[in-house]
Amino acid sequence: MIDLTKSKAAFEEAKKYMPGGVNSPVRSYPHMGCPPPFIQEAHGSHITDIDGNTYIDYVGSWGPMVLGHAHPAVIKAIQKAAERSTSYGAPTVMETEIAELIHQVYPSIEKMRMVNSGTEATMSALRAARGYTGRDKILKFEGCYHGHGDSLLVKAGSGAATFGSPDSAGVTKGTAKDTLVVPYNDIPAFTKMMDEKGDEIAAVIVEPVAGNMCCVPPVEGFLEALRRETEKHGTVLIFDEVMCGFRTTFHGAQARYHIHPDMTCLGKIIGGGLPAAAYGGRREIMNCIAPDGSVYQAGTLSGNPLAVTAGIETLKQMMAIPDFDKILEKKTKDLLTGWKQAADKAGVPLVCHQSGSMFGIFFSEKDVLNYHDACSANAAQFKAWFLSMLNQHIYLAPSPFETLFMSYAHSDEDIEKTIKAADKAMEEAAKVK
């Protein structure tokens, strides 16, 4: 067993001043039976806690650290930017530079606006869609998490699912009634809802690759149905690529599946590990945003120079490496192949999902296509697996509903060590029914 004595003490102290001792619920290691390691530093593919334990990290700050932690070029760029000031609250040429870079990678984003979090991005995109269409209702998919905005915390995934509360207290009935929900990957249910309510729906928002009920890719024809029906009813189609952006492929899920949404939300990677996100899309929709239009959205720290600098440098580093996304996809495939072999040897039913460099596993005998399937996986086996991996210095997300991430910094040796650890962890999972 690893020693988490200092982390446990730090956790108890944190609980005095923060709800649950954390600033985001899943970090509290709910239901895992151990305190969360309190992190001190991270470099490359490794992360170290205050007890001195060093782990191979597959959380990657929940997605942003695609190059690995503390990448020298990114750190240097941030340091240079900080010497000029940490914030201006005024326009900079860097904001235009990152917008041009993002448009180059995502041509469907003709105009965009920087914000500080994925939640801000999705909230703002929905407001823009409502302003553009003059409609009130939105449609989302069960188990897809789009941040903690009121209208989006209805049958949500991620931490809400981890705590068994896909709906949140504090969301008014009036807000909830304008949010329609259908199962992810259920084409007939979606088509039926659009037939009944399509002309009232301002936007359909979806994670094109669901990453908050673990990793669940779209079934064949699902995204095509979304595009077809939204065009038919004049509804704005929003791809929430905060998580899967730059990971399913460098050009995102919309390139992988050849579906072009009206709007896109991005985050995580575009801040290079600092707080940054963006929403954007078709010119005529984005022209509704103030000061050009009547849809208001603003932010003191939007376009913060440190976050924008980190994002620009991260994207440039990725673009400079030939076949960057293919390299990460192969690393991920190699890891999952080893995990599946370990599960087979231990006699543990395991479903492995991957989309580029985001991935996840389900302790399940049947494939997982939606939130109901994800909830049916064996949570007790996941806990046994997770704790065994943690004790072998493999840092994974402490919830079966969270996706894992590969980085460019992960070496062949890292992957080999992780597969070796999986052999023992699957044996532990096999002891649990």
Residue map of PLM features:
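Conserved N-terminal phosphate-binding loop of PLP-dependent enzymes in the Aspartate aminotransferase
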Residues: 1-433
